[in-house]
Amino acid sequence: MKNKTQKNRILINKEVYSKEITKKFLKDITEKILSELNLNNVEISITLTDNERIREINKEWRGKDKPTDVLSFPQDETIGYKYRLLGDVIISLPYAKAQAEEIGLTLREEVLRLLVHGILHLLGYDHETNEEDAKIMFDLQDKIFDKLTCEL
């Protein structure tokens, strides 16, 4: 249930064009994800980019010279700032589109899935450490995805 008094700051940067994935769609679906996670008064940055740019970022920050679907960069708390800084989620739209076709989702569904995944990483969830942590993260991701898919 969305709280009308909720005040989040959602910054959207689209480096690639998509008629289907608009800034409004990204902002609205991010707000719903934050609401599902009971997060209020947070700031988050969402960037849609291409495979080449995400490859560069992946190489620089993770040492992996290849494109990927989503990257997350958590922020440190800033004392005295109006919002709790969650961090940045970067999604490769071409990668997401190819992945959606491969697994049988619409592009909007795949972007939703990647946003949930990225935001969970910002909150400290991890699926690469051990199977137990992976199960916790993916169960929550699936729960939020399943609930919000019908609202697309």
Swiss-Prot record:
Enzyme class per UniProt: hydrolase
Cellular component, GO, one term: cytoplasm
Zinc listed as a keyword: yes
InterPro entries: MetalPrtase_cat_dom_sf_prd, YbeY, YbeY_CS
Positions bound to Zn(2+): 117, 121, 127
PROSITE patterns membership: UPF0054
Gene3D superfamilies named among the record's database cross-references: Metalloproteases ('zincins'), catalytic domain
Annotated cofactor note: Binds 1 zinc ion.
Localization annotation: Cytoplasm
Keyword Cytoplasm attached: yes
A molecular-function term among this protein's GO annotations: RNA endonuclease activity
Main location: cytoplasm
UniProt EC number: 3.1.-.-
Cysteine disulfide links: none
Pfam families: YbeY (PF02130)
GO biological process, any: rRNA processing
Co-factor(s): Zn(2+)
Keywords, alphabetical: Cytoplasm, Endonuclease, Hydrolase, Metal-binding, Nuclease, Ribosome biogenesis, rRNA processing, Zinc
Function summary: Single strand-specific metallo-endoribonuclease involved in late-stage 70S ribosome quality control and in maturation of the 3' terminus of the 16S rRNA.
Family: Belongs to the endoribonuclease YbeY family.
Xref: HAMAP family: Endoribonucl_YbeY (MF_00009)
Protein name in the entry: Endoribonuclease YbeY
Source organism per UniProt: Sulfurihydrogenibium sp. (strain YO3AOP1)
